[in-house]
Amino acid sequence: MNVTLRPPLAAAPRRPDGAGSVQVQMDPNLVIGTARVFSVYGKGGIGKSTTSSNLSVALSKLGKRVLQIGCDPKHDSTFTLTKRLVPTVIDILEQVNFHSEELRPDDFVYQGYNGVMCVEAGGPPAGTGCGGYVVGQTVKLLKEHHLLDDTDVVIFDVLGDVVCGGFASPLQHADRALIVAANDFDSIFAMNRIVAAIQAKSRNYPVRLGGVIANRSAATDQIDKFNERIGMKTLAHFPDLDVIRKSRLKKCTLFEMEPSPDVERAQNEYLRLAASLLAGVEPIHAVPLKDRDIFDLLGFD
């Protein structure tokens, strides 16, 4: 039997800003400017939008002009701030056949609680398009309308734990990346993958890892164990308080809830976190684990 051997395939060149992955290349002119920029990541359903929205309000309570950008096709990042699901940038652009010059700022920027400005970038339909394009178009619009000139802090609230080139694109604008995680295996496993993505981006962009925000957890023993192993640190801790769940159902932030010891406790922790971020958190040079090593590290003997 004659067998035809194919010549070996040449190795694909590695992209400059990722561990061999295909990354979305952003326009180098799309620089946000002088605002402090934070990207919030974490496992899907862990409370990133709740964390982002309450952090945005806390920053505004400290006198800062804050812009929150939701980067999720569900476009529900800012609904506790605006009390509704606002149209996405992509929805608005489609209405004008992507002629962005026809848009005004109030077509896609909405004012939320305590003056926090809100934008929902949205995303392409499932299975199509690229989230990086959506983020790029959003930043481009904000730049064209000079909306970033009067902003002190930008918060990117990013889809789930997706760290592909598209939804990793906010890292290309961020100063610090924050990870929301619970004290459980799935959250920490996702956090480890996100750490790897952030470290890959930091080779060619200013973004650095800022730390983890422990959420929905009475204890932090597993997070602490992981942090000690890879060189991470916890920036804030929010227990699984029922007032946080109720605030989402009431479509409001914690800063609008009726006063109670738990509400005050959570508010104070958000204000403390906001103040520490404004003061500047040292960059973390964590070394992510191999997947199998996490299985060996976490849990009980």
Curated annotation (Swiss-Prot):
GO biological process: light-independent bacteriochlorophyll biosynthetic process; photosynthesis, dark reaction
Cofactor: [4Fe-4S] cluster
Residues noted as binding [4Fe-4S] cluster in the record, renumbered to the chain: 130, 164
Highest taxon of source: Bacteria
Residue segments, region Disordered: 1-22
Pathway the protein takes part in: Porphyrin-containing compound metabolism; bacteriochlorophyll biosynthesis (light-independent)
Entry-linked CDD domains: Bchl-like (cd02032)
Residues holding ATP: 45-50, 74, 215-216, 239-241
EC numbers, comma separated: 1.3.7.7
UniProt keyword ATP-binding, yes or no: yes
Record's catalysed reaction(s): chlorophyllide a + oxidized 2[4Fe-4S]-[ferredoxin] + 2 ADP + 2 phosphate = protochlorophyllide a + reduced 2[4Fe-4S]-[ferredoxin] + 2 ATP + 2 H2O
Keyword Nucleotide-binding: yes
Gene Ontology molecular function, alphabetical: 4 iron, 4 sulfur cluster binding; ATP binding; metal ion binding; oxidoreductase activity, acting on iron-sulfur proteins as donors; oxidoreductase activity, acting on the CH-CH group of donors, iron-sulfur protein as acceptor
InterPro entries membership: NifH/chlL_CS, NifH/frxC, P-loop_NTPase, Protochlorophyllide_ATP-bd
Compositionally biased tracts (Low complexity): 1-13
Assembly, per entry: Homodimer. Protochlorophyllide reductase is composed of three subunits; BchL, BchN and BchB.
The protein's name in its UniProt record: Light-independent protochlorophyllide reductase iron-sulfur ATP-binding protein
Natural source organism: Bradyrhizobium sp. (strain ORS 278)
Underlying gene: bchL
